[in-house]
């Protein structure tokens, strides 16, 4: 049982000098990031799924004990809306295999306009290999119900807990791990603002409760502006160590 705290993405120019020293080449950012954090969520994979060689490269560059979560491609989640996922799952398997001991969770974020469809979700989850941990982030309100939670639990997939403007914050674990995305405390805009320490202390208490229940926790800050994600992740880690 462990808590993995990191950020959504790592290659941001505006994270100088909070995390990266001046003049650090973009290609060296991940190695520098891994000196400060033990996990990250790869978001660029949503726009273009990487080749297996890219996953192998990350595996070689990342230290033992580091875990990389990866966002599923929009070709699967937004274009096909999980319909006939087999071809995409083959590509995902190939990359996931290369990541080997560095792999954490495959994040499947559904489109905001995609309403509840239990049959399609179940068909997809049934075809994900058992060795790939999956978390599903629902953006349409119709998904947030007991029947969907039960479906996720039956397939050992995690309901993605969300914190952000206009998003319901439902603390409902459905797997042996919990996946949390922190999209920022701003009430009007996603990915904006910095979480106050009081809020982070509340989240630290929730993480302890999940750990006591025997669940691993993966929590990623997505409020990257002004390096807020970096500072918030560090603060949460400090609060957990108290």
Regions found by a protein language model. Give the residues of each.
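Residues lining hydrophobic/aromatic ligand-binding pockets adjacent to catalytic sites
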Residues: 1-242
